[in-house]
Structure formats: structure tokens, C-alpha cells
Amino acid sequence: MTPAAASTTAAPPADSTDTLDKTTLASFTADPVHGKQIFAQCQACHSAEPGKNMIGPSLAGVIGRKAGSIAGFAYSNANKNSGITWTPEKLFQYLEKPQRVVPGTKMTFPGLPKGQDRADVIAYLKNPT
């Protein structure tokens, strides 16, 4: 696929959780302690504290939240109009390669290719302490 073709590839449907690596969240035993360590990469742009938006929105309470819904945060139109609700499974897909799931998102992070790392970050975000 050429770079031009890649940029026009449609996002998976909002209710899809298919990953590029064909893994599922349920296939991993998540470790929130390791997830907190991996989340250190995310802290360049995100906080896990409620109401603390940075370059990216706060990820406190992200699970179950509609994408692009924190009042006062300047989301991309792609994110606001994605129709996504952040279930653990959808986050697992998104964190693999954010631009694939929400083309046009402001999030420039290329993703976490390892399914275990994604599962661990999600476990941490469920209860960030």
C-alpha cells in the first residue's frame, strides 16, 4: 500500500474491536502495576487525574466515556465525530495504532504494538492509583 493509499484507508467501525495483531484484550492477564510503568510514556501528554487536561485530555474515567466528550477540551473533529465509546476492548484496539482507529486524531503517539502493554495500561486506567 502506498502512503497516499494508507492515509485514505477508512477507520474500522466504531463498534469494531479488531486489532492488527489479531489479539484480544481477553487473551491477556493484565498487570496494572506494569501498566502504570507503561503509562509513564502517556504522561507526556495525558494525566490520570480527574479534570487535569494537558496536551491531551485527562484519562481519568476514560473507560465508558464517549470519545471527544470532556467539556472544554479541544478535540479533533475526527475524535468528536468518531461515534466511539471507550470500552476496554476499544481502547485495546485504539492503543495499538491510534491513527488507524481515528484517522485525523490529534494524538501523534504511534501506539503500543505489544498487546500485553496495552492490556496493562488499560488495567491501570481502570483504577489509577
Named regions from a protein language model:
Residues M1-T8:
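Short, low-complexity, disordered segments immediately C-terminal to signal peptides
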Residues T8-I38:
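Electrostatic cytochrome c docking/interface patches
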Residues P13-S16, A71-A74, V102:
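Short, basic/glycine-rich phosphate-binding loops at helix/coil junctions
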Residues P32-K36, S47-P88, K106-F109:
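Gly/Gly-Pro-rich "capping" loops immediately C-terminal to redox-active cysteine motifs
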Residues T87-T129:
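C-terminal capping alpha-helices of c-type cytochrome domains
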